[in-house]
Amino acid sequence: MSFSPLIRQLIDALRILPGVGQKTAQRMALQLLERDRSGGTRLAQALSQAMEGVGHCRQCRTLTEQELCPQCADPRRDDTQLCVVEGPVDVYAVEQTGYRGRYFVLKGHLSPLDGLGPEAIGIPQLMARIEEQGTFSEVILATNPTVEGEATAHYIAQLLAEKGLTATRIAHGVPLGGELELVDGGTLAHAFAGRRPIAL
């Protein structure tokens, strides 16, 4: 089917969203144009306002409308712990655990094949933040449990060890409520390697 230039432009714009292919973008565009024009207008306004008003926190680099995000602006947070994550979405996930320390958001993970080295993802800024703050006794490496995430955590841990700082890695393994027969071998091996005594 051939769409008019404006409809084609809308479909192509919607396709930049993760997980949205050609068919889904077409359905979204036609839904907005045929049945929910007020919703489309609200979406356009919200998107425009967010693109104009949302930037990065000057301390942790997560997304925020202020100079400091709510976590960095909160004086009650634990200044001895720094949690390093790959992206802003990970901050929201870690917050759900009740973690009360500070954050540093990388711009992804190390990926030499994609041209992403330490500078590209912000490791020099991370090390500068740790040195400037001077209060962190533990750096929690909460990068994703992928080959690249593990390599990134290992690289950062080596840099921290050279400075005499403690790095810890979040545990990986069997999900709570999961059944062993449904867990892949790599995940199960990681869980066995990271086993610990039961606290009584």
Curated annotation (Swiss-Prot):
Query: Some GO term, biological process aspect, for this entry: which one?
Result: DNA recombination
GO MF term set? DNA binding; zinc ion binding
Record-linked CDD domains:
TOPRIM_recR (cd01025)
Q: Which InterPro entries match?
A: DNA_Rcmb_RecR, Rcmb_RecR, Rcmb_RecR_Znf, TOPRIM_dom, TOPRIM_RecR
Record has Thylakoid as a keyword: no
Chain's role: May play a role in DNA repair. It seems to be involved in an RecBC-independent recombinational process of DNA repair. It may act with RecF and RecO.
Protein name (Swiss-Prot/TrEMBL): Recombination protein RecR
The gene for this chain is recR
